[in-house]
Design a protein with these regions (language model features):
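DNA major-groove recognition helix of helix-turn-helix/homeodomain DNA-binding modules
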Residues: 49-64
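Conserved hydrophobic/aromatic packing and binding residues within compact polymer-binding modules
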Residues: 11, 25-26, 36-39, 65
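A detector for short, charged/polar N-terminal pre-domain segments
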Residues: 1-6
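Short basic helix-loop element that most often maps to the first helix and adjoining turn
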Residues: 9-28
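Recognition helix of helix-turn-helix/homeodomain-like DNA-binding domains
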Residues: 30-45
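Residues within helix-turn-helix
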Residues: 23, 34, 46, 52
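Conserved amphipathic alpha-helical interaction elements at protein-protein interfaces in regulatory
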Residues: 13, 17, 45, 57-60
Length: 67
């Protein structure tokens, strides 16, 4: 599994643990829902800044998203 796949799996898991939709995560992170969807489908290649924004929204460390 490559790093983008790990990000997608971990992001989706953490989002669902919080009971959030993609729209809710997008709102919290200041991103578009379609961008969140693209990351989870491994069709988008997010920047480090975007990964950090997602981690802050999910209240986790960046490393938790990439492990």
């Amino acid at each position: 599994m490559d790093v983008r796949q790990r990000l997608a799996v971990n992001m989706k898991r953490l989002r669902k643990e919080r009971g959030w939709s993609q729209e809710a995560l997008a709102d919290e992170a200041g991103l578009d829902r379609t961008y969140i969807s693209g990351i989870e489908r491994v069709v988008k290649n997010p920047t480090v800044t975007v990964v950090e924004r997602i981690a802050l929204a999910l209240d986790c460390r960046v490393g938790n998203l990439l492990d």
